[in-house]
Amino acid sequence: MRAASLFLLFLPAGLLAQGQYDLDPLPPYPDHVQYTHYSEQIENPDYYDYPEMTPRPPEEQFQFQSQQQVQQEVIPAPTLEPGTVETEPTEPGPLDCREEQYPCTRLYSIHKPCKQCLNEVCFYSLRRVYVVNKEICVRTVCAQEELLRADLCRDKFSKCGVLASSGLCQSVAAACARSCGGC
């Protein structure tokens, strides 16, 4: 077993000594062959020069700007008729959200070292241990989701709403609190 591990340990060094692994490989192409078709462009100084712009006199520049302004189309803003009243939308938008903190419990698993001894020979092994961590979590609550949840709750647990409006909420308070958050 020792001989096999020593053989595997020194195998890369032996292959390197034989020249199978060359540390400085030659480039795949000779340097003089690459980029020969660019030499004319690089040596020509006018290749990269852009034509110079001559500034226009202020009169021409103003005339050009006024022509541009004339060509723009004017779209009037929509106006309401005097008799119509625009109402606010009843559905909340996607931006009606807030962050809400709530207590939460998370379960983590960690590996705890555990010392074990057999006949005066001690070693450590890792034992998986679960840790219960009580934290304050944050969630984003949007008004749209709250309305949908309230609608679902009202449809699914209609007796909670009926009993709450009739004043008999205490008789089913526990069931309604579990299902919909209370009366």
UniProtKB/Swiss-Prot annotation:
Spell out which residues are annotated as carrying Sulfotyrosine: 47-48, 50
Biological-process GO terms, alphabetical: embryonic eye morphogenesis
Domain annotation ShKT: ranges: 153-183
The organism sits in which domain of life?
Eukaryota
Which PROSITE patterns does the record associate with it? SHKT
- Can you locate the Isoglutamyl lysine isopeptide (Gln-Lys) (interchain with K-?) cross-link? 20
What the entry says about post-translational processing? Answer: O-glycosylated; glycans consist of Gal(beta1-3)GalNAc.
In terms of InterPro entries, this protein maps to: MAGP (IPR008673), ShKT_dom (IPR003582)
Its GO CC terms are: extracellular region; microfibril
Q: Where in the cell is it found?
A: Secreted, Extracellular space, Extracellular matrix
Q: What is the effect of changing residue 34 to N?
A: Some decrease in transglutamination
Signal peptide (UniProt feature, chain positions): 1-17
State what changing residue 41 to N does. Answer: Little effect on transglutamination
Tell me where in this chain the PTM Pyrrolidone carboxylic acid is found.
18
Give the primary localization class. secreted
Using the chain's own numbering, where are the disulfide bonds?
A: 153-183, 160-176, 169-180
What keywords tag this UniProt record? Disulfide bond, Extracellular matrix, Glycoprotein, Isopeptide bond, Pyrrolidone carboxylic acid, Secreted, Signal, Sulfation
The UniProt family comment states: Belongs to the MFAP family.
Name of this protein: Microfibrillar-associated protein 2
